[in-house]
Swiss-Prot record:
Disulfide bonds: none annotated. PROSITE patterns: HEXAPEP_TRANSFERASES. It is an enzyme of class 2 (transferase). The active site is at residue 361. Binds 1 Mg(2+) ion per subunit. Coiled coil: none annotated. SUPFAM superfamilies: Nucleotide-diphospho-sugar transferases, Trimeric LpxA-like enzymes. This is Bifunctional protein GlmU. CDD domains: GT2_GlmU_N_bac (cd02540), LbH_GlmU_C (cd03353).
Amino acid sequence: MTQLSVVILAAGKGTRMYSDLPKVLHTVAGKPMVQHVIDTAKQIDAKQIHLIYGHGGELLQQRLSSEPVNWVLQAEQLGTGHAMQQAAPFFADDENILMLYGDAPLITKETLERLIAAKPANGIALLTVELENPNGYGRIIRENGSVVAIVEQKDANAEQLKICEVNTGVMVASGASFKKWLANLNNNNAQGEYYITDVIAMANQDGYKVQAVQASEFMEVEGANNRLQLAALERFYQKTQAEKLLLAGVRLIDPARFDIRGSLTHGKDVEIDVNVIIEGEVKLGNRVRICAGCVLKNCEIGDDVEIKPYSVIEDAVVGKAAQIGPFSRLRPGANLAEETHVGNFVEIKNAQIGKGSKVNHLTYVGDAEVGSNCNIGAGVITCNYDGANKFKTIIGNNVFVGSDSQLVAPVTIADGATIGAGATVTKDVAENELVISRVPQRHIQGWQRPTKKK
């Protein structure tokens, strides 16, 4: 099987984005456009990925530092052909070279596999698409059904402008062919640039076959040159993802008001209300219900969990039949056992909450272990930070912590203990002890409230 290398063009400035950020780093579904393209290139088993960079190259390399790409500088942006010329020295004669664009993030593995499979043994395969309004795109010129040239909009005559089949810019040919054609490119055109599309005419002159493969969906090959186009890509992507989830059995109350910016795996009878955002890798069990306005990121949710409105869960695990929210925040390291309750305005960070325990109101639990069947009252704080270091709070089983208590870590509260409301606990508490640390109540007779001065 012939090996494949991929060239991704990513040197453009993106002037119409009106941004200091390189165009290809603008995001779709929370991920840079160029990252989508790199990920797709990996899926088709590219031997090597050549990334053509220019504007904002330092930032681009920083953001993609973990990616196994060959960085190829295009110091001057003189057209798509010029960009490919920079990568040509790295091409092996006997490999296939696939050309992609860093600002066209939604092209699929399946489409690229069709294109590669269609490449003639001696020739080039080109991805095209039919448009109702082809304005702005290079037109596909055919003779007797075969592609003989691509004419850019600014160079097209009146008859050619009527053609609706357009070039997507995606093509595949052998390394040897590309090197030969790229060496013969010129910039004799209205833009004064080196067009990669000129290789189509060269292939015909050499007697090579040019095979066109049509993309099934225009948005799959659409690029983003401005924020309006970027928003259109985002909406198309989200619509596609929502449709996949609906067909897989997930109930989305309103598919148009659901965003996924990562991956979602799910069980049966999952229900997701409006304005929910999924980020990173999220796993949902059976019969999970997520109410309006929640954000879930890199978390695992067990069966029969209900997440009430406007809760945020990040890098956390929630056990079966738990109830979360409304307005709860589970931060990284939160691990809730089954049948736990976490209520409104509760924040849990790097803490384990045991089976059946309840933390229902206005509470912070950080760097802690809470046993089973505990009740943590409203306004309780685990004081885990002394300004320099963090310390752990350990709470046993069947512990009752009264409202407005402060647990100053490091501290351990043993099984069955009761902490009276308003206590400040600084020492360990033994099993079944009652701790009260409040100031004795005083009654002042005849006291009068201050009055305002006239």
